[in-house]
Amino acid sequence: MTKAKSVFRFAFAYFCCSLPGVVPAQEMGEWRTLRGLGGVYLIVEDEKTGRFNVADGLTGDQLRQDTEEKLRSAKISVIKTQEEWLKTSGTPYLHININYYLTSARKYSGSIELVLEQEVVMVRDNSIKLQARTWGVKIDEFEVDNLQKVRGELGKLLQQFIEDYRNANNSASINQRPNKSCS
C-alpha cells in the first residue's frame, strides 16, 4: 500500500469517527451488563452544579421527571433514596451529564452522556469490588436554539438504554445483540 493510500485511509477513518451524533453502547456485550438489573438510582448532574435554570428553558428537575417517567413506563424501577440504593444488589446508578455553552450565534452547543455505573468484581481477586461504568451512550455534539430540544435528545439516549435493557433481559437475545441502528 502506498503512503498516500495509508494517509487517505487514516484521514477517512478519523473523519468518520469524529462525526457528531449518538455513539452506541459498545458492541462487545456492554448491553449484557443490564441483565438482571432490578432498578436504578438516578443522578442528574445539574442537581449538584445548578447549571440549568429556568431562564435557559431547562431545569434539572425537568430532566429528572422526564427520565423517571420514561423508565417507569418501560417497567424499569427507579430507586428513590440513597439508603434504598445502598441496599440494592450492585448499587446501580444511571448518570445523566449534559454540558453546554451559549455560542456567539445565540445557540446552545454541547454534549450529552448517559452512563450506568454499578458494582463490579475483579476477576483475578474477587475480594475487590468497585463501582465502574458498565454501559453508556452519548451525543458527542449538539447545537440547538432552545434547550428544551435537549430533552428530546436525552430521550433518544434513554430509549437506547430501555432497548438494551429489554434485550438483555429477553431470553431470546441472551448471547447476541439484535442488529439495530442507534440514531
Identify the function of each model-found stretch.
Residues G21-Q65, E163, N167-S183:
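A structural "domain/chain start" motif
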Residues G38, V44-K48, T67, K75, ...:
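Generic secondary-structure microfeatures
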Residues K5, F12-Y14, L71:
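Intrinsic disorder/low-complexity segments
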Residues R9-G21:
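Bacterial N-terminal signal peptides
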Residues V54-L86:
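N-terminal, post-signal-peptide region of Sec/Tat-exported proteins
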Residues Q82-D145:
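Surface-exposed short loop/turn segments
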Residues M1-V7:
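N-terminal secretory signal peptides that target proteins for export/translocation
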Residues Q26-R32, M122-S183:
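C-terminal/domain-edge helix-coil "capping" segments
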